[in-house]
Amino acid sequence: MNHSVVTEFIILGLTKKPELQGIIFLFFLIVYLVAFLGNMLIIIAKIYNNTLHTPMYVFLLTLAVVDIICTTSIIPKMLGTMLTSENTISYAGCMSQLFLFTWSLGAEMVLFTTMAYDRYVAICFPLHYSTIMNHHMCVALLSMVMAIAVTNSWVHTALIMRLTFCGPNTIDHFFCEIPPLLALSCSPVRINEVMVYVADITLAIGDFILTCISYGFIIVAILRIRTVEGKRKAFSTCSSHLTVVTLYYSPVIYTYIRPASSYTFERDKVVAALYTLVTPTLNPMVYSFQNREMQAGIRKVFAFLKH
């Protein structure tokens, strides 16, 4: 049951300095367009090319969809607010944004772990890859990703909706996220904080450890490669993947592992930008555009568009 007496929230945005609004607007617009178009290109390439049918490309397609939902649920509203100075969001709109963002956050973390496992099987058991990562396994893994993400998002959104917001209603952030909403609550938030800790430990820290374990086995397998060029290419791919994963998990763990009383929103807004915009922009470049088959698929898309 919703006990809220607040019908809308005021979003302060990234900065209160008017002279920086133009620069921030342009930066976020460009990065959002790069993220959106990059991920959309992956989706089109996967759908258009029948050769991209292995589980890895299904996971990349799913990651692209998740990244588009993550950025689109936040950035357009933020840019619109900066253009019109209409910095309010309805209670329902705020809860919807929170649900979509929390869903994408959970889905992305579990997807990173799933993709790391897929690469582990492909590199460490190449002869058995098609047997292990068959259609049923792929469907099961994707179902697990969606189930965990939806459950995580539903629980956190429901716990936020049970809180009483009686004023003030000003969110010192650029979107509706759990920490700033907890800071506005007039009712106890202990249960919310406990569930955030549980989710952070199981999803963020747990998935990060599992992902690192998979890449650890991959690195051991790479060390057995005899050619220097083969090792170099494999290490280059692994290091870029681990960089993106670390860049994503670190700010998420940092943001959600602390009690609400310790939040410093000026700093946390910059940290949030890493996992809401920077990582979704880097994902296509690191995971897809370096792949030869995906490059060939993208070239086919551009060739089709020319005709």
UniProtKB/Swiss-Prot annotation:
This is Olfactory receptor 13G1. Keywords: Cell membrane, Disulfide bond, G-protein coupled receptor, Glycoprotein, Membrane, Olfaction, Receptor, Sensory transduction, Transducer, Transmembrane, Transmembrane helix. The keyword Membrane applies. Belongs to the G-protein coupled receptor 1 family. GO terms for molecular function: G protein-coupled receptor activity; odorant binding; olfactory receptor activity. Glycans are attached at N2. The chain crosses the membrane at residues 23-43, 52-72, 97-117, 137-157, 195-214, 235-255, 269-289. InterPro entries: GPCR_Rhodpsn, GPCR_Rhodpsn_7TM, Olfact_rcpt, Olfactory_GPCR. Odorant receptor. GO terms for cellular component: membrane; plasma membrane. Disulfide bonds join C94-C186. The keyword Transcription does not apply. It is a multi-pass membrane protein. Residues 44-51, 118-136, 215-234, 290-307 are cytoplasmic. It is found in: Cell membrane. Residues 1-22, 73-96, 158-194, 256-268 are extracellular. GO terms for biological process: detection of chemical stimulus involved in sensory perception of smell.
